């Protein structure tokens, strides 16, 4: 494992993922409200268009696919070998995306969205916009769900792509 490369790849994909998701959250704000804390989600629900939610999920899945492909291809070309090393490379890189999500989307984007009154219709006066309330949902997600469930899945996908590429090339 090449730690400096893991850090740089993790940071690069963290920026790509989080700024990509952040950008589209301003294009389809009502759809993105479905991923916010419960109070905001419920307040915004009458204004959410199902077609926009489908677009949002297509965008997010496309961004995830690009991230996983980059991780797998980059790991393959870095010369990392062995399933354990490939897995941990993908895991650590996705951990960077996770913490970037916490800082960029859950802290920075929340503050920007909160200050743009009317961006998410119906949720303008929700208590869940306050940092403490928001973090009640964000911290368990980023300190438990991502490291225990999602990062290992990312590690498996990264290892799978790199192993597949090693058999092809």
Language-model-derived ranges and their functions:
Residues 58, 133-152:
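Hydrophobic alpha-helical transmembrane segments
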Residues 104-126:
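Juxtamembrane non-transmembrane "cap" segments at the membrane-aqueous interface
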Residues 8-30, 93-112:
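Hydrophobic alpha-helical membrane-embedded segments
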Residues 23-45:
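Membrane-interface helix-loop junction between the first two transmembrane segments
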Residues 156-169:
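Juxtamembrane boundary at the C-terminal end of a transmembrane helix
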Residues 118-140:
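Short, membrane-exposed interhelical loops at transmembrane-helix boundaries
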Residues 44-64:
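Interfacial helix-start motif at the membrane-water boundary
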Residues 5-10, 82-90, 143, 147:
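Residue-level signature of transmembrane alpha-helical entry/exit and packing/kink sites
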